[in-house]
Amino acid sequence: LFDYPENWTITKEEVSQTDETVVLTNERGSTITYTYIGGVAEGQLGSGSATDMTRIELSAVADSQFIPGYVDARNYEDLGKFVVAETKITGTMDMLTDSDFVDTDGAVSFAVLPENRTGTEETTDLPLRVQNTFWYSGYVSFTAQAPDGQFTEAEQTEVIAILSSFRVEDN
């Protein structure tokens, strides 16, 4: 579950036996995407590049209401505290021609992630929606992207509020 203001609308909602995707969009075209990917074994979500790496800085900007618990008789409390993280691309490397990362002032996005994922990640997993997943009886991502890679101040405030409201439904 998550809350969102009236100026964000659901522009896509797809549910299958194993997957779910919900996309919120505002008038400028910024998006917030919730994705659940089931039917894929843990550790088997492939989407990486064989030649390109990306360096990403993940910084906690707010606490998340998401508190992991039991799903299908498995306890996920070991995932720990969740946060809303600002994710910024800070470097790229072509592994065929570069020997180190080339510094980049890249796109900013936001994601709900375990707090222990903050810091610097070097990855071949892109797009960021795939890279910013966590395992919770399936792959979960809750991310926000701006069409030009940068959010307005008002959008950033709304995005952080929406992402931080993500939580498990109480039964």
Describe each PLM feature range.
Residues L1-F82, K88-T90, D94:
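Secretory pathway targeting signatures of secreted, lumenal, and periplasmic proteins
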Residues D78-N171:
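Short, well-structured beta-strand
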